Amino acid sequence: MQVNGDLGNIKTYLLKELEDLYTLSVPIGQLSTHELNERMLAITDILDREVAVYMNRQGKIVQVSLGDADTVDLPEVQRQARSEHSLSGIRCVHTHPSGDVRL
């Protein structure tokens, strides 16, 4: 699976860490897991950049994105066709390098 964002000058081992986030899953009914949070925070601490993961309703990570120190892009995520009035079923968990909780 592909990591989105500006990946220039990212060391190979960190790119692998980002790609490995796709192997994790989150149990239904949970927003995230300790392991996922720890891995995302470790990458954020090293790069001083936001990391975002997008999960479907089953807890499968469907997208990983790397942002800059202030923002991370929300790419278009492919999903099954649904009514135009239904929710996407995709949730986002992301980090803030500065610790600022405001979006």
Regions found by a protein language model. Give the residues of each.
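A short catalytic or substrate-binding loop motif that flags glycine-/basic-rich loops and adjacent residues
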Residues: 44-48
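Active-site-proximal loop/helix of nucleotide/amide-processing enzymes and allied scaffolds
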Residues: 1-23, 76-103
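Short, charged/polar surface micro-motifs in flexible loops or helix N-caps
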Residues: 59-60, 98
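Short, basic/aromatic recognition patches
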Residues: 27-42
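Short, structured surface patches at the beginning of a domain
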Residues: 25-28, 53
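Structured interaction and signal-relay segments at domain junctions
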Residues: 62-77
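Short beta-strand scaffold segments in enzyme catalytic cores
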Residues: 50-57
